[in-house]
């Protein structure tokens, strides 16, 4: 078993001055913590993997393809591989768990 604490992951991500911290990688999936501060621009490009986002804190909008929805703590979003997507109108610091399948390269 592998277990993680969100507060420890956030501290590690912040200490490394990065927006993304991959903290688990297995044969069929990887998981990371993604952070965007209020007002930030999301620089993402489409990925070669399916993704699931679980918002652990913050508020924003996300556009996936041509669809846009508001997200906040507890929101879960599925993004198919190759589809354009980005968070925007980030009104509260956003922290998101990201699951990639297959694992991110």
Locate the predicted segments by residue:
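Ligand-binding loop in jelly-roll beta-barrel domains
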Residues: 81-105
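Short strand-coil-strand connectors
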Residues: 27, 63-67, 90
């Amino acid at each position: 078993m592998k277990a993680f604490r969100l507060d420890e992951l956030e501290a590690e991500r912040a200490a490394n001055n990065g927006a993304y911290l991959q903290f688990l990688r297995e044969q069929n999936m990887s998981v990371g913590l993604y952070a965007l501060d209020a007002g930030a621009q999301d620089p993402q490009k489409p990925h070669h993997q399916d993704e699931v986002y679980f918002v652990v804190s913050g508020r924003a909008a996300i556009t996936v393809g041509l669809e846009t929805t508001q997200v906040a703590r507890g929101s879960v979003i599925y993004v198919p591989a190759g589809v354009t997507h980005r968070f925007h109108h980030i009104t509260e610091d956003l922290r998101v768990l990201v699951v990639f399948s297959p694992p991110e390269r």
